[in-house]
Amino acid sequence: MSVKPLTELTKNLEAASNELLKTKVLMDMELNYLSIEQLESAQNITDFLNILKQTSSQYSTFIHQHFLFYLLKLSTFSTLNYDLESIKQYMNILNNVCDVATTIHATSSSNFLNNQTVINHIKQYITSNATFTGLSEPIVPNNVISTFRCVEEVVHVCFQCYWHFPFQAQIPQIPNGALEKWLLTQHFKFLNLDYTAFNSLKDQATYLITHEKHLFVPLSSSEYSLTLPLAKNQALNIYTSFTTNTITKSNVPVLAFSAKELTDATPELFFLYDFIIEALYHEHSYNVPQNIIEQFISKNTQFMTDLCNTIQIKCSNKSLTSSEIRHIKELLESCGLTEECCHRLQTSVLISNVSFTSNSWKGYETFISLISQLVLFSDFFYKCLFYFSPTSIGHSKITEILNTVSAIESETLSHANKFSWKLANMLSFFIPKAPSKIILETYTHISPYLMKSAFSIWAKKTWNYTWLDATSPHPTQTHTFKHAPVISQSEVQKYCENLQLGTTEYDSRIVNSHLFAEEFITHHIIPTLTAILQNKVQKNRALFQLRWLIVFASDEAKGLYRIRRPLGLLYFQIIEIFHDSNAAAAAILNVLDYLNEIQQLIQYYVPTYTTPIKFIQELFSIKYKPQSTELSKSIQKFIAETETCVKDILPFIQLGTNMCNTTYYHIENTYNINIQGQSPARLDTKALTHAIKAIQGLTKESWTTISQSYKELQTAYIQLATILETIEKISQHSIAIKVSNPNFIKLNNTFLQCFKKYNTIANLITNSHSFNLTRYFRQIFEPELIPITTVQKILNFNDETDDPQPFLDSLSQPLYSHTNAPKKSELTSEDFNRLLEFANPVFETAPSSIKLHYSDTFNTPQVNINWKTYEHTTYIADSPAELQFTHLTSAILDAELSK
């Protein structure tokens, strides 16, 4: 819906040459917004009312008498911010509009909607919110102004401000170790909590860099630039706090961990350790013993299980108070599961698949599944919380979010989210309830059926409220025509036959007849509507004709009220589809419902009438073809990116497979490698380990790109799932239309094929040798079971003077179980050449930066110059020699050379 200034509405009304065109302007405005800032001008409102006086329809008269209700119902603020200063500005604007309206006189027959009542309600709302600070729950008006767009916007931003409340829960303040202290201090700073009890961030960063050097691993950027971005960012934060100099991210190592950090980590602060989650997700253990990793997994799995149980109990209620919602938010934030943490884990870690079958850590699958479940829940919890308010704005936004959740949990995408939770059900407490009483009262006090139709569409679109038509009283024929003059049917029939489409003048005597409705329906509504629905009329002409059917003799032709109500709804819905690319998902379904109601009313007079569908078919295409095009582009993009990445990754997979099926002979720091048709090649251990890391890293980088593309495809499929749900309802409607163009069923099958291909590719890549190359060559990366120095000490052991502890420490290292090696083959010369490309990097690590420090002191004896002796700054010889110059020509040069 677009925003228009009141001056433009006034200008369009003034330009309209007849009653019908003026009504069109007012009707079209019902589907747009007005800029509320223009209502602060009395002149703008007065000009609008003066032009409105020139029309005499019931519709325009009602607007003139209740102009504040009409204008504020459609008014919106130009910008919306959820800070206290902005909220005060919005209140001031509302107050100014009320002050201006007070100076403009208008008579009204409705106490519920009259201008003074509206002014009183708004003034009362402004007064009640005068002390709003964002700490207490905002006040919500419980009267007609809650249906005004501008008032809903103020209520909504107040709630947005309220949900950004200061954190008040308790967090463990005794960290275990220097690293946890750093993470906790960072967390306190992010939550705007007092962290003065800890050392400054600079002091902590200095301590970590100087005393905990084992935490910083200078891995190559090609290996971990994509697979460990969180560890990189954590290290960057520490280095940034350590120095004020500019830090180059590519030169910063990644933040790692040892057995001590895993043992000391507090489970209640688990999600502060996002870099550990990232490392374990990608199975980087940094040589920490398996039993230590499994203990870490076990204690944090227990913590997450308890957290899940608490959340599930709290979300089991269909409605929660604000304090209960606040408590869930604090529960998540206290363990580090903030909105930003969810985003980091979603985009950097959980986006890629993880293989549970190849991992040997006990409890690993449950551990990762709980992380995924909590992150997904928290992500959508924060999204819902941001939009949560008891307004139609909140209802629309949250319904859209939960539809997305339902699509994610559909059978198609559930393979990636095998959770026991149904998030859409758990988060349903966020959906605000419609203010039914206020909507019904407002609808009842609106007298023009055109405005009733527009209000009904608003209630259905914003609140999904569909009870208005069922509960609204309609005038009966007995009551309406009790005092109508007796006119013969032939006279009414002749009048309708001669009535020209588009005329605005009418015979009151005839249109008040109880026979007029049947004849008007027979001679005008049926043929006009049939021509429109057969798509025989140009679009603008069709809208004009439909509008005329609605407004002709609208003030007196009471017998047409029942059929004009769905005609009005149909008109507004068609306008929305034509002019709004983001029209409601159920727009076509609404059109079918309105046409079905019109058909039933017509069949009362003409039982054989059926609704043509050609025009509806075109509406279906207008509504859904752009979406079909965008979804097709998403598929094409996924296929293109995946094909490119697979093409790039296949050589690595082939090389990794060949490497794992080749025999290696280790001699000191060198490996002999069998080459087909050649003598064995030699490669030093350092070069081989670098090649292994590089091949695995590049494989994972390509896989991360595929996973990112798949994530985008999932997002597109969520949109398709919502469309398919609506189209399913359309296909089952009593007015049957074809839903095969655009063919979303075919599109859905294409998506499913892409998902199937992705799963196949995922299994092939994640279970390939190159993806897990460091695991296959883990012996190279493991520490020696018994170092050479220890062996030498054993050989030269002296019972009296030597300590046996080094030997005992070596024996205490766990022995990893290795599978039997498969039958070995040999590398081809091409394979070995490619291996050498990765084994000999130009720069293995980034060079250390050279830092020079200067002062005003000399590091050599000061130079003393006797300026009385040295009177000149240039050298002057004591006895200048006389220099003789000869002009050299080519002739002289030739003569000299010929001598």
UniProtKB/Swiss-Prot annotation:
HAMAP family: HSV_ITP. Keywords: Host cytoplasm, Host Golgi apparatus, Host nucleus, Virion, Virion tegument. Coiled coil: none annotated. GO terms for cellular component: host cell Golgi apparatus; host cell nucleus; viral tegument. Residues 463-899 are annotated as: Interaction with large tegument protein. Belongs to the herpesviridae inner tegument protein family. It comes from Saimiriine herpesvirus 2 (strain 11) (SaHV-2). Interacts (via C-terminus) with the large tegument protein/LTP (via N-terminus). Pfam families: Herpes_U30. Plays an essential role in cytoplasmic secondary envelopment during viral egress. Interacts with the capsid via the large tegument protein/LTP and participates in its transport to the host trans-Golgi network (TGN) where secondary envelopment occurs. Modulates tegumentation and capsid accumulation at the viral assembly complex. The keyword Isomerase does not apply. The keyword Heme does not apply. One of its GO terms (biological process) is virion assembly. This is Inner tegument protein. It is found in: Virion tegument; Host cytoplasm; Host nucleus; Host Golgi apparatus, Host trans-Golgi network.
